């Protein structure tokens, strides 16, 4: 198994506590509401949201994938840290065993947030995972992130 790592930082005008709440704690209800063209629904299959929880994210038609299952490994509200893996779904294909994701929400100097994201693509055997394939996954996530961020900025009580 090979591991391809992609690291990035995303800035947001939303303060860290609110950003963590929006993008992690309220994900299950907020994302299907704000981006129904991308995320159709989120089902908690097992657990209470903390470590060990398994969620099924169902995507809207036209997204290119039907669903993924996430397994939560760490949910640290005090330090605004979230770690999960995609353990099932057609995004994994025959090349990927899993995708693991670490997200840390840190204060930015302007009062907003710097989200540090480390994504690890765990390949099956010697399978190659090309940079273009990584970019597609990251760009799709970035579009959804931006749409939700815009909604929260326009609706601060969300």
What are these regions, as identified by a protein language model?
Residues 1-2, 106, 132-158:
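C-terminal helix/juxtamembrane-tail motif
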Residues 8-10, 68-74, 98-107:
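Hydrophobic/aromatic beta-strand elements that line small-molecule binding cavities or substrate pockets
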Residues 3-9, 39, 54, 67, ...:
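Intrinsic-disorder/low-complexity, polar/charged segments enriched in Ser/Thr/Lys/Arg/Asp/Glu/Gln
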Residues 19, 23, 55-57, 72, ...:
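Structural signal for hydrophobic/aromatic residues that build the beta-strand cores
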Residues 1-50:
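Hydrophobic ligand-binding cavity/cleft-lining segments
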Residues 27-30, 40-94, 155:
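Glycine-rich portal/gate segments that line the openings of hydrophobic small-molecule binding cavities
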Residues 83-140:
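Beta-strand/loop substructures that line and gate deep hydrophobic ligand-binding cavities in soluble
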